[in-house]
């Protein structure tokens, strides 16, 4: 077992404990909110996710197609683009992101599920942060359907100039448009 496998198993285990109303293959029933941190040190219900935490279905979360992704004590960033996926049961979710925190100014736009714009051009000064919340619906398609819209995962695409992410919270049962 290499360090990455060890880390993802520990992070996934921490996430499972944190995910005590999600139902599905990855989350036990009763979870209220999933918490991910991309900065700082482990904090109870918020596992730290650092590159190269590549998405694997068994782990249930990770980065996908994210060239140039850099992890620091202040969060993750890339020159222009990165993507983070999370296995989720079909449903509507309230997603809260904390952007910024990196050593450079960042401009971040977020797309979710089949490239739907959720957040546009959030400018964050060096060392500062911004919190944004949006609602997204995760769908499950027919077996073998691998489109970003119906693959059983929440797909979040971060793009812009030095797009950055410090924290991610996912809460089930949000009302569409809310």
Predicted features and spans:
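Bacterial N-terminal signal peptides that target proteins for export
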Residues: 2-14
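Compositionally biased, intrinsically disordered or flexible polar/acidic segments
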Residues: 22-178
